[in-house]
């Protein structure tokens, strides 16, 4: 499981865009949660940190860190 801290999400549409982008990425098994208030996404899978960062940044958001 990975927790991705994301800056720039400001509404439910933002969280939906992040969820859709992550779900489309090879190596992401499931998106467990995308939290607007917590500014993070929680995923299961084997996608690399670089791939996760790239797909989120392509949507216009910044990855702060991945745990």
Q: Which residues make up each language-model segment?
A:
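C-terminal structural segments of small proteins and small subunits
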Residues: 20-24, 28-30, 42-67
């Amino acid at each position: 499981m990975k927790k991705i801290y994301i800056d720039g999400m400001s509404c439910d549409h933002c969280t939906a865009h992040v969820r859709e982008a992550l779900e489309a990425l090879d190596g992401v098994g499931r998106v467990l949660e995308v939290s607007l208030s917590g500014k993070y996404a929680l995923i299961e899978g084997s996608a690399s940190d670089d791939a996760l960062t790239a797909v989120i940044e392509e949507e216009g958001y910044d990855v702060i860190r991945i745990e």
